[in-house]
Regions:
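Active-site region of chymotrypsin-like
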Residues: 35, 41, 52, 112-124, ...
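C-terminal recognition in membrane/secretory proteostasis and scaffolding
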Residues: 27, 65, 73, 96-97, ...
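Short glycine/acidic-enriched loop and turn motifs that connect beta-strands
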Residues: 44-45, 76-77, 144-146, 542-543, ...
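A short, Trp-centered hydrophobic/proline-enriched beta-strand micro-motif
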Residues: 31-45, 139, 497-512, 603-605
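Short glycine/Trp-rich loop-beta-loop segment that forms part of the substrate-binding cleft
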Residues: 68, 91, 125-156, 552, ...
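Boundary at the C-terminal end of the N-terminal hydrophobic targeting segment
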Residues: 20-23
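Short consensus segments that form the blades of beta-propeller domains
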Residues: 48-51, 146, 314, 514-517
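Bacterial N-terminal signal peptides
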Residues: 7-18
């Protein structure tokens, strides 16, 4: 044979098996793929190690007759969940969670096979013994959200330690993991790891962010659980509350393993190169004090043990029984008898929702991270109620009002006796300091959110809930009561003069509305009328009427307050409180100055710091300048048409007042919130006393503020002349205001207002009703109800315009609808003022993660303008369109974003986890009801 023919023959011999293998893989993948599904997961509540979230993953059919789908535990989730599976032919089925392992990263969903009309998936066979080093594998899954991706690899390890995802997160233990370099990523969780025959040899569970390594769960315990579910039996899981770690022999010898024990185990388990060693003993367990870290496990009930599957097999079949545990410690053999605990009793299966807070029993998963006994109530989500008290996520509640809280039932029973607005003392530990308990005062508040308990029902695949009974009525003197106090002398005459007129203000929002992203605020309030209990604040302290306001007097007495008035145009608001509740506390109205402040004037900045101390700082006025903040990305309130005082090295750590040496207030030292790109910031500036007086006058008059609905910006006379302003008007403006040679130029017109199509950007304002105006204050003073005549300079000539002002009340928000996890209300002025958006439709202010709004992208900042093709102009229209829709039904929503781009989405209702309710503001405050 010639050399060429020889080479070709060798090449064919090499390529032929490769081609055959490729063909085998192609056939296998074609056969397996129809049984792999993409799973859309909506974890409706934060629970245990998981947050509420909308995400995606993978699963695969393991029993086509029963509709069982295998995936990861963290995909089934330990808490309330809704999920759907999408087959490769794009058929969609509803899933019900039927099992999640207490420790290992696997679980099962169930679907109704009869609901499939076109797909005919076959069950994939689990083959635990097929996981061997060197096995070529393929991972089929929804990798990176691509519905179906196929990733190749070769099993490199079958005895890898379980991956560690960090403290406070879900972590598997007491099992080996498989490892290969297949570069799986988000969305591929729950993917089948198959061999060339199509058998499943592992379950994809996680991967390394810094390498191509992927980690797969072995299937021995999975196969057992599946068999029990198929036979209708409970999946028993036992534990000693001990975490073992597989340790090689070289390290075991240093721990004191005897030569005889090593010889015996090497002979019994020739494939193993190590044994199991105690790595953690859970405090409070029976094993605590009997087993120690470093103990080498040699036998269980007399049977030698060297790996996790054998250990689990014995424990899972011995729940409730006692077993003999044999270990070696420092070369000495020891034996202890321990009861096998049911793992399900260490996994929470019920929750309490109260004030947006989610609470449940502490799990072994989280107790491990804290090194605490599995006892107490875990804060899965601090929500509105506990955030106000400073209790964080991950905290464990141990006592309530001095009563021990061992389990959720204890807490539910204790809270049932707490009236609305009453304070209770909660003792808890934080995850970063589990050995250092803390105590916080929590104020009971059930007006904003549903209050209910929910318990998992695996047979139904749901979490049925029961509303808590109404709280008892507070007895006189229990809630919201105050006594009298006095104001101590500070030793500073200015602070002493102002102390009786300044209060600490705390404001907490239960929902994000009006484009406001932060929910908890602290600041300084000014008592402007002690007889009526009237307190002035800035809108960066009280940004809306939807929330809870409380005032603290003399750092001693705390009173509830009500939002009385929100200035519709400027950064000011008014609160009211009951003066009678202060007894004879010598609170007095602040003394407002007459002269105001000018550049170079000295002033005392006085206010409360974050720690409650009243402080003062002598400063000087640097300038009086117009505000010029960027438009809000979230469509929140933004100050405009106002000149503010800027200080030389003004305070940045408190707000309050600017006063003269006698204690007369000449300005409010306010903080202004603004958004610069994606960054939210705030800056301190002074609001002149003249503007404060006009606010109080408007409130006392009828509470209505008239607005031309035009945003003005000062321009110099030189700039105006470049725009064609003639000499006559230049002289007239100079004579009208010799020290302020400028005009107001129209920059924006509020969409939907009478000024649209009349006033145009670039118009120079000359006069209103014949009176020359060139400042914001003059323009506002001239804007009264009724048709106004504006004289403007446009395109080189005078133009007379007729504009009807718009009257705005101080009620910024009266209704909020919580629907499908979205917070909805009528469009607000900031949208129209900043972005030129017509105030029609329904504004999406916020959406909750894990909700239908999150899943179907009903995103914040959009407006809903149609429901199923029918127009909606306001919240009433929307509520009428969605009323009486059955749970699980779908509807079409037309959305419009901030720049007018339309979008059509579909949304499926989930009334069980996300019931609709309406928040309404009445004479007695806000109340919640079904719409």
């Amino acid at each position: 044979m010639s050399p060429a023919r020889t080479t070709l023959g060798v090449l064919l011999l090499v390529l032929a098996p490769a081609a055959a293998l490729a063909a085998d893989w192609a056939d296998t993948l074609e056969r397996v793929a129809p049984s792999v599904v993409a799973i859309q997961v909506d974890a409706a509540r934060a629970f245990d190690t998981e947050w509420n979230v909308s995400t995606q993953a993978t699963g695969f059919v393991v029993d086509a007759e029963r509709g069982l789908i295998l995936t990861n535990r963290h995909v089934v989730t330990p808490g309330p969940v809704t999920a759907r599976a999408i087959f490769q032919n794009r058929e969609e089925v509803v899933l019900q969670a039927v099992y999640r392992d207490p420790v290992h990263d696997f679980g099962f969903y169930r679907y109704d096979p009869a609901s499939l009309r076109f797909a005919a998936p076959r069950a994939l066979r689990l083959h635990p013994a097929g996981a061997r080093v060197g096995t070529d594998i393929r991972v089929l899954g929804n990798d990176a959200g691509e519905q179906l991706s196929i990733l190749a690899g070769t099993l490199a390890r079958i005895d890898r330690e379980a991956p560690d995802y960090g403290p406070g997160k879900y972590n598997d233990f007491n099992t080996f993991y498989l490892q290969a370099a297949s570069s799986t990523s988000g969305g591929s969780s729950g993917s089948p790891v198959i061999d060339v025959t199509g058998k499943v040899v592992g379950l994809n569970a996680g991967g390394s962010t810094g390498a191509a390594s992927s980690f797969y769960l072995p299937l021995a315990r999975v196969a057992r659980a599946l068999a029990l579910l198929q036979s209708g039996q409970a999946v028993t899981r036992g534990t000693l509350q001990v975490v073992f770690r597989y340790t090689p022999y070289d390290q075991l010898r240093r721990l004191g393993l005897t030569a005889e024990t090593e010889r015996r185990h090497r002979k019994l388990f020739p494939a193993r190169t190590g044994m199991l060693v105690v790595a953690e003993v859970q405090p409070g367990s029976e094993a605590a004090g009997q087993l120690e870290v470093g103990d080498i496990l040699t036998a269980l009930d007399g049977s030698p043990v060297a790996e996790f599957d054998a250990l689990a097999a014995q424990l899972d079949d011995s729940v409730g029984s006692r077993v003999s545990v044999e270990v070696e410690r420092g070369g000495l053999a020891r034996r202890v008898d321990l009861r096998v605990v049911d793992l399900e009793t260490l996994s929470p299966a019920s929750l309490l929702e109260l004030g947006d807070t989610v609470l449940h029993d502490l799990s072994w998963q989280m107790a491990r991270h804290l090194n605490l006994p599995v006892r107490g109530v875990y804060v899965a989500n601090p929500g509105f109620l506990l955030t106000q008290a400073g209790v964080p996520r991950g905290a464990v509640i141990e006592e309530l009002e001095g009563r021990p809280v061992a389990a959720l039932g204890d807490l539910v029973e204790a809270l049932a006796a707490v009236p609305q607005d009453q304070l209770v003392q909660v003792r808890y530990v934080r995850p970063e300091e589990p050995l250092n308990p803390r105590v916080s005062a929590v104020r009971m508040d059930r007006r904003w959110f549903p209050a209910r308990t929910c318990r998992r029902d695996d047979a139904a695949g749901r979490w049925p809930c029961r509303d808590l009974p109404e709280p008892p009525v507070a007895e006189p003197g229990q809630a919201g009561q105050a006594a009298s106090t006095r104001f101590d002398a500070n030793g500073d005459p200015v602070l002493d003069a102002l102390a009786p007129s300044l209060v600490q203000v705390r404001f907490d929002m239960p929902y994000s509305v009006l484009g406001i992203t932060e929910r908890n605020y602290r600041g300084t309030g000014v008592v402007v009328d002690a007889g009526r209990g009237l307190v002035l604040v800035d809108r960066n302290t009280v940004p809306t009427s939807l929330g809870v306001a409380r005032l603290t007097f003399a750092s001693t007495l705390e009173l509830p307050a009500r939002v009385a008035w929100i200035h519709p145009l400027h950064n000011l608001a008014l609160l009211t409180y009951d003066p009678q509740a202060l007894g004879d506390t010598p609170v007095r109205s602040v003394r407002l100055g007459e002269a105001g402040l000018r550049p170079a004037d000295e002033a005392w900045a006085v206010g409360f710091k974050g720690d409650g101390r009243l402080v003062g700082q002598l400063t000087r006025v640097a300038s009086l300048d117009p505000v010029d903040f960027p438009v809000s990305r979230t469509l929140a309130f933004r100050e405009a048409n106002l000149e503010t005082l800027r200080l030389v090295n003004g305070p940045t750590d408190f707000d309050g007042v600017l006063a003269d040496a006698s204690g007369a207030v000449q300005a409010i030292w306010a903080t202004f919130a603004y958004q610069d790109g994606r960054r939210t910031a705030q800056v301190g500036q002074g609001i002149a006393v003249e503007d404060v007086r006009s606010l109080i006058e408007a409130y006392d008059r009828d509470g209505i503020v008239q607005s031309l609905e035009v945003e003005w910006q000062p321009v110099s006379l030189a700039a105006a002349r470049r725009m064609g302003l003639d000499d006559a008007w230049t002289r007239r403006i100079s004579e009208h205001s010799p020290t302020r040679r400028s005009l107001l130029m129209a920059e924006r017109v509020v969409a939907g207002s009478p000024a649209v199509g009349v006033v145009e950007p670039g118009d120079l304002l000359l006069a209103i009703d014949g009176r020359v105006v060139n400042t914001f204050r003059e323009a506002e003073a001239a804007t009264v109800a009724g048709l106004r005549q504006l004289l403007v300079w446009r395109a080189g000539a005078e133009v007379t315009l007729s504009v009807e002002p718009v009257g705005w009340s101080g009620s910024d928000l009266d209704r909020v609808l919580v629907w499908s996890g979205a917070t909805l209300h009528d469009p607000h002025r900031a949208m129209s003022a900043q972005r030129g958006i017509e105030a029609s439709g329904v504004f999406v202010a916020y959406f909750m993660f894990g909700s239908p709004a999150s899943r179907f992208r009903l995103l914040a900042g959009r407006r809903i303008t149609e429901v199923d093709g029918r127009p909606v102009t306001d919240l009433d229209d929307f509520m009428a369109e969605v009323a009486d829709r059955p749970d699980g039904s779908s509807l079409r929503l037309k959305l419009v974003d901030w720049n007018g781009t339309p979008e059509l989405i579909t949304l499926t209702l989930d009334e069980h986890h996300w019931p609709a309710y309406l928040l309404e503001r009445g004479t007695d405050g806000w109340a919640r009801r079904r719409p």
